[in-house]
Amino acid sequence: MVEGVRFSGRIEFFDPEAGKGLAVIEIPTEHVATLGGRQQFRVTGTLDGTPFTGSTMARKGGSFCVAVSKAALASAGLGMGDQAEVTLARP
């Protein structure tokens, strides 16, 4: 397992201009290398203490994010625009 990271992030749409679609949380630049670099991979973690699994992905503009399912958001009691305490690790 790769060392995990902890940060606070806002839940937003993958394509904010569209205003709909996939929910993501941007991963701060300083944590990308710890997780294994800018490539797509599965992660496990928590959203405000609630366990979830997701996948990382690059966004246009050069940022890197993790996708969060509707079920994971509902379990954590979170929605679009909410701020969450996030932990991520590669299994």
Region annotations inferred by a language model:
Residues M1-G62, M80-P91:
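Long, compositionally biased stretches
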Residues H31, S69-A74:
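Short alpha-helix capping/helix-loop boundary micro-motifs
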